[in-house]
Amino acid sequence: MSGTLLAFDFGTKSIGVAIGQRITGTARPLPAIKAQDGTPDWTLIERLLKEWQPDEIIVGLPLNMDGTEQPLTARARKFANRIHGRFGVTVTLHDERLSTVEARSGLFEQGGYRALNKGKVDSASAVIILESYFEQGY
């Protein structure tokens, strides 16, 4: 067990990616993966898994503020199930409420509107999802 985790912020056009270490509780963004109507380039995901060899994958679970599911929730679950089915790695779903808002705010502080490109926001969201997972003691 390396203690390495990959996190994905699922989206229909772009999937944010972050890598983190359980021992330090830290995460950093990786380049986002383009998706077509929620379907990623599976060869890119396979490459990420081979390169980083994570012990676990965290997929952000989009929920409404009251905790109820939204249309994207089922698609994120399906994405998580497909990762597990294709690659046999442990996949955990983690509440991602407000991660995009927090990511946008942090990126804006760093570089204004120019820093808010879609891929950067999605991968920054994946970092926040993974850090939140660590903070909850996982």
UniProtKB/Swiss-Prot annotation:
Q: Which Gene3D superfamilies match?
A: YqgF/RNase H-like domain
Q: Taking the first listed entry, what is the main subcellular location of this protein, grouped into a coarse class?
A: cytoplasm
Q: Which CDD domains match?
A: YqgF
Q: Name one GO cellular component term.
A: cytosol
Q: Which InterPro entries match?
A: RNaseH-like_sf (IPR012337), YqgF (IPR005227), YqgF/RNaseH-like_dom (IPR006641), YqgF/RNaseH-like_dom_sf (IPR037027)
User: Single GO molecular-function term?
Assistant: nuclease activity
Q: What's in the keyword line of the UniProt record?
A: Cytoplasm, Hydrolase, Nuclease, Ribosome biogenesis
* Entry's localization field: Cytoplasm
Q: According to the UniProt entry, what is the EC number of this protein?
A: 3.1.-.-
Q: State if Protease is listed as a keyword.
A: no
Q: Name one GO biological process term.
A: rRNA 5'-end processing
Catalytic EC class: hydrolase
Record-linked SUPFAM superfamilies: Ribonuclease H-like
Could you confirm whether the keyword Cytoplasm appears in this record?
yes
Function recorded in the entry: Could be a nuclease involved in processing of the 5'-end of pre-16S rRNA.
Q: Identify its protein family.
A: Belongs to the YqgF nuclease family.
Q: What's the protein called, per UniProt?
A: Putative pre-16S rRNA nuclease
This chain's source organism reads Salmonella arizonae (strain ATCC BAA-731 / CDC346-86 / RSK2980)
